[in-house]
């Protein structure tokens, strides 16, 4: 099933910041036990990529993505760690195009009608 469809069916995506990658698996287990088999791990900490990898390795069925992604390099690190989707706080056409080129769903933030028009022009 398509990642965006999975997230739509789950209905809510917990956004988490993990400072210690060792905390990722117990947190993922708690989310799954609570009926939320998904998470957006923010790239605001140095542990983000390792946390994503730990969660995906322990629970391959979990839909884990990366949030607060600002650059193509962060996209690559997140995807290499196992992220199944990317969220960014703003609309950076370079980052969006990179996600599209490598086949990872991306949800950029939009703040005004111009952002929406750019997103539409990018096929989002």
Language-model regions: role of each:
Residues 1-84, 101:
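Conserved N-terminal beta1-alpha1 strand-loop-helix module at the mouth
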Residues 47, 70-73, 79-124:
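Conserved anion-binding
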